[in-house]
Amino acid sequence: MRSVLSLALLAANVVTAAVVSPFDYSGYKVIRVPTQKDNVKEVQRIITDLNLDTWKYPKSEGQNADIVVPPSQITSFMERISGMSMEMMHEDLGMSISNETSFEAYSAGYAPDINWFKSYHSYQDHISYLQDLQGLFRTRSEYVDAGKSHEGRTIPALHIWGSGGKNSKPAIIFHGTIHAREWITTMVTEYLAWSLLSQYNKNADITSIVDNFDIWVFPIVNPDGFAFTQTSNRLWRKNRQPNPNARCPGRDLNRNYPYQWVGPGSSSNPCSDTYRGAQPGDGTEIKVHIANMKRIASYHGIAMFVDWHSYGQLFMSPYGYSCTARPPTDARHQELSRIFAQALRAVHGTPYRTGPICNTIYQVNGDSVDYALEVLKVKLSLTAELRDTGARGFVLPADQIVPSGEETLAGTVAMLKAVIRG
């Protein structure tokens, strides 16, 4: 990582470090174009003709197109969308990234507190933080090296338990950062872990949750991709595993799970952001996570799995692979999704939509939620798209971390209380 450290120490025992990405997004714009029946095909053509990247691709009418436009294409793009509604998400994406990646470097050994959540952080600082956080609560938690990524990085996990000791209750599993550029998910899953540990025996609801479940938090499911977003390209999505006979590396790990692997919700093109891989479950990190989930399930089963993503402000249930099929537990999934969204909104007024993945966001093949439910027989399998709805998208300012954590914790606590009640 290339970084520049300030000379002044801050009050929270941190220093400011500006991380510069070799891919320069200066002058790039991110523009939202809402689609409807009379323009969706034209918007799709514009994206194809100008070879533009998208944060959100409009697969059907009514969906927003969030489009990344390089300086060389701005004039042509604006001419092509003349007469259409549009919203500027990032006037200068390079400037937005520069502001977001002014990290506060963590001092190893520093007692973790709310200050951690005032900034985004490097991969290695996340490892130090998780180890230090666990060190404060040694009798009811453990830091786990859950396995290695394709490039040999640790996939970290925190294991949290209450009365009865570890591996004595049904498990809750939280996944974050399976998509590398979704930095807010790293911070929010760590906020959940910090809250569950620090508020145990202080907050009755959190104490009850920790006493009723064995909790596993995996904040960085895709460490190679995450590190790559900090050193090379902030908007990278996939892992970094090479693809034989292809110039583009990486698999979309959330299209690589070995269940309903082939379909319109994934791609066979190695250069696509939704490339499913050469074989079901051939992603190095997916092999690690499947092995971990099977091991965790072998104790007392898995009560709930939640895969945290961004962006869109959605809380969703199975299925991703089909827009018509519903699991037998659909009503319960929908009930818990509504409980989560209502409790979350009560904190800062942030609205979330709920519903099955395929109907709420888009069709997805080979995803974690469907795999967990149907193959691992997890009782409740859910996924979230955290803040925001597109004003900033993947490049979410650091001042959104704490409110995102606060509201997500409230939604999660309310949902798990409902699970305990039955």
Curated annotation (Swiss-Prot):
GO MF term list: metallocarboxypeptidase activity; zinc ion binding
Active site residues of this protein: E385
Keywords carried by this UniProt record: Carboxypeptidase, Disulfide bond, Hydrolase, Metal-binding, Metalloprotease, Protease, Secreted, Signal, Virulence, Zinc, Zymogen
Residue sites binding Zn(2+) per the record: H179, E182, H309
Record keyword Protease present: yes
Domain of life: Eukaryota
EC number in record: 3.4.17.-
Maturation propeptide residues: 18-112
Main location: secreted
Major enzyme class: hydrolase
Domain Peptidase M14, residue spans: 119-419
A GO biological process held by the record: proteolysis
Signal peptide residues on this chain, from the entry's feature table: 1-17
Annotated S-S bridges: C248-C271
Single GO cellular component term: extracellular region
Cofactor detail note: Binds 1 zinc ion per subunit.
UniProt xrefs under Pfam families: Peptidase_M14, Propep_M14
Subcellular location: Secreted
Cofactor needs: Zn(2+)
Family of the protein in this entry: Belongs to the peptidase M14 family.
Chain's role: Extracellular metalloprotease that contributes to pathogenicity.
Name of the featured protein: Metallocarboxypeptidase A
Taxonomic lineage of the native organism: Eukaryota, Fungi, Dikarya, Ascomycota, Pezizomycotina
